[in-house]
From Swiss-Prot:
Recorded GO CC terms: cell division site; cell septum; plasma membrane
Residue intervals on the Periplasmic side: 22-94
Name the record gives this protein: Cell division protein FtsB
InterPro entries: Cell_div_FtsB (IPR023081), FtsL/DivIC (IPR007060)
Length: 94
C-alpha cells in the first residue's frame, strides 16, 4: 500500500510538471495567447488600412474631386483659368 501511495505521488508530480512546463502546457498556452493578441492587433491595423484604400478607390471611381486633388498635389496641375500661388515660409527647412 505504501509503494502504491508513493507511485501515485510520483505520477501526480509528473502530471503537474507536464501540465505547467511540458509541451502544450500552461507556459506554451500563455505564449500562444500573447502571440494571438499581437497578431490580432496587426490584423486590425491592416483591416483599417484596407478600408481606407477601398474608400479611396471608390472615391477615384465615382468622383472627379479625388482625381483633381491628386492631379494638383502629385502632378502640380491646375485648371484652365486658375492661378497657382506657392507661398514658401522663410523659416521652414528643406
Amino acid at each position: 500500500m505504501r509503494t502504491f501511495a508513493i507511485f501515485l505521488l510520483i505520477a501526480l508530480g509528473w502530471l503537474q510538471y507536464t501540465l505547467w512546463f511540458g509541451k502544450n502546457g500552461m507556459s506554451d498556452y500563455a505564449q500562444v495567447s500573447n502571440d494571438v493578441a499581437l497578431q490580432e492587433e496587426v490584423n486590425q491595423g491592416l483591416r483599417n488600412r484596407n478600408e481606407q484604400m477601398f474608400a479611396e478607390i471608390d472615391d477615384l471611381k465615382k468622383g472627379s474631386e479625388a482625381i483633381e486633388e491628386r492631379a494638383r498635389h502629385e502632378l502640380g496641375m491646375i485648371k484652365k483659368g486658375e492661378t497657382f500661388y506657392r507661398i514658401i515660409d522663410e523659416n521652414s527647412e528643406g
